[in-house]
Amino acid sequence: MNKLMSAAAVAAAAAAGAVLLGTPAAQAAGYPDKPVTMIVPFVPGGSSDITARSVTPGLSKILGQTFVVENKPGANSAIGAQALARSTPDGYTMMVGSIGTFAINEALYKNLSYNPSKDFEYLTQAVRNPNVLVAAPTFPASTVAELVDYAKKNPGKVSYASSGTGSSDHLSAVLFRQRTQSTGVDVPYRGGGAAIADLIGGQVNVSFQNLGAVQTHIKAGKLKALAITGDARAADLPDVPTLAEAGIKDMVVYSWQGFAVPKGTPAAIVQQLSKALQTALRDPQTEKTLQGLGFEVVANTPQQFAAFQQAEVKRWKDVIQKANIQLE
């Protein structure tokens, strides 16, 4: 009898400890027991959509439930983000968003329908990829130094194409001009494809474009690569220097994608989803596929991603305020 009581006492103590520690076993028992909706706040085929569809098979295998991708595009990802913010915080609605969704929009919009810093629990920063400073083949500058020199000798004449006002490529150009104390003209397009097409055609001079979107054009000689915005050279473009190597300090910039759930989601579910996402992202075949598309897998913890998100908000808020950019 005493032995039975001792065993029961040990089990009770272990269970109590699990509750106090907030472990998934104690807090998320039975989760998930129905399909999970994964919001993508952009149209199909973009970086966030690719990231979502790359991990859903792994998540389903790990957690034993279907993960349904639901595209909710519009308002520079605000429609999908607002839908997540207003959803029940039970772990059955999550979202993959971008640097714009989770950081830039907070600094850019005067009246944003959601608050990236208050409305979400962050799960993991999934992937990141640098931008490449590219120039039209006919543009006279072929290095960063030549571009800066040309811009200073021809103030306000260099045209910077971007995928839209407030995009990471637009703000990379703004930050570049701040760092180099040079000037230029922003030419926003409705998406990166149109910007790249006009850049190749020589209608605009330079642009900071996503590595995956321009590397084939660079290798084909249709665009000139001046520098990469990452903290190291890209394996696929080993001859292209980083901006730091080109003499531009404090300008490491990555576009990135990450996962979040609504604020108030139980901590155990947050941890369970985060660990499952990290495992799915680190699957060798998934990682190889993402790398082939120009992504670097990050797969960090909720705490690391939340801290990074706050640092990114502050950084881009400083850049945007200095440039006096604001959208309604």
Model-found features: residue ranges?
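Hinge/capping helix and adjacent helix->loop/strand transition within the periplasmic-binding protein
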Residues: 86-92, 99, 107-194, 243, ...
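Solvent-exposed, polar/charged alpha-helical surfaces in well-ordered, non-transmembrane soluble domains
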Residues: 53, 57, 61, 82, ...
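Bacterial Sec-dependent N-terminal signal peptides
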Residues: 1-9
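C-terminal lobe and pocket-closing loops
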Residues: 128, 214-283, 311-314
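N-terminal (or domain-start) structured segment
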Residues: 27-119, 157, 165, 181-206, ...
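C-terminal segment of classical bacterial N-terminal signal peptides
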Residues: 13-26
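An extracytoplasmic/periplasmic, membrane-proximal ligand-sensing/linker region
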Residues: 33-35, 178, 182, 219, ...
